[in-house]
Amino acid sequence: ELEEAISNLIQKLEKDEQILEVQTKQGIEFLPLKNILYIESCKHYLRIRHVDGECEMRGKISNLEKWMTNYGFIQTHRSYLVNMRFMKMVRTNEVELDNGELLSVSRDKVQDVREKQMIYLRSFAYADN
């Protein structure tokens, strides 16, 4: 049990330290994934909303989605990749974040988003024990 608890703690710490390198017009920003609320795709740009503000970079959300789902992010809509850490509530057609922002959820993704959020929340409840 002790080994398993230590292993879970190490995995949690490693996830907390993941960084997204964002090439902006001003230069390169290094954003810890744990500080990113969501990423919104708009045409050929990605708007990255984080705890200290937002930034923008060129790119496709599909390129980030494959990697970021391993670190607590879920695609709620073709335009949004959301950090489950900041999700307060999943409604029929939207997700409410802790800060009150509302983001779209596709009808075909609502059930999957709810299930994954429950799994995510349970993993933290067990990690805290």
Which stretches of residues belong to each language-model region?
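Short, charged, intrinsically disordered terminal tails
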Residues: 117-129
